Amino acid sequence: MATDVAVETTMGTFTLELYTNHAPKTCKNFATLADRGYYDSTVFHRIIKDFMIQGGDPTGTGRGGSSIYGEKFEDEIHPGLKHTGAGVLSMANAGPNTNGSQFFITLAPTPWLDGKHTIFGRVKKGMGVIRRMGMVPTDKEDRPATEVKIVKARVVREEDMEA
């Protein structure tokens, strides 16, 4: 059964489908952090038009965040998964095997990231929200001029879908 995570932001809600078969450890980390409320009230601290939006750092600086496995954990690079277009969900890192809690969502194809970042899902619903987030004006450090915040992120349970 697929795992989906609904992410409610100050700009709207989007749903992520996690690739649990291809990156089980990464998906478990993301889903567990979401259910614990770890991502609630965090900002998308880096937005680069036509490239990606990045969030998941509780410090909001791009230098923070930990995984459920400790500070960092290893990559789960799958050769069949590529950054082929907008809506690809990947782990942000500072080099090999430095995954924590930060993630990014692509706004366009980014093939130079293939093999360097763990792809662990995609935007299933709400790509318009992601595109609007990608248009937010930023400063010279790619920080949004207007705060874009995750209000709440949670795993979608089957009973939630029936309601």
Curated annotation (Swiss-Prot):
It catalyses: [protein]-peptidylproline (omega=180) = [protein]-peptidylproline (omega=0). Keywords: Isomerase, Rotamase. The keyword Isomerase applies. Signal peptide: none annotated. GO terms for cellular component: catalytic step 2 spliceosome. It comes from the Eukaryota. GO terms for biological process: mRNA splicing, via spliceosome; protein folding. Its EC number is 5.2.1.8. PROSITE patterns: CSA_PPIASE_1 (PS00170), CSA_PPIASE_2 (PS50072). GO terms for molecular function: peptidyl-prolyl cis-trans isomerase activity. Residues 1-155 form the PPIase cyclophilin-type domain. Coiled coil: none annotated. SUPFAM superfamilies: Cyclophilin-like. PPIases accelerate the folding of proteins. It catalyzes the cis-trans isomerization of proline imidic peptide bonds in oligopeptides. Belongs to the cyclophilin-type PPIase family. PPIL1 subfamily. PANTHER family: PEPTIDYL-PROLYL CIS-TRANS ISOMERASE-RELATED, PEPTIDYLPROLYL ISOMERASE DOMAIN AND WD REPEAT-CONTAINING PROTEIN 1. This is Peptidyl-prolyl cis-trans isomerase-like 1. The gene is ppi-1.
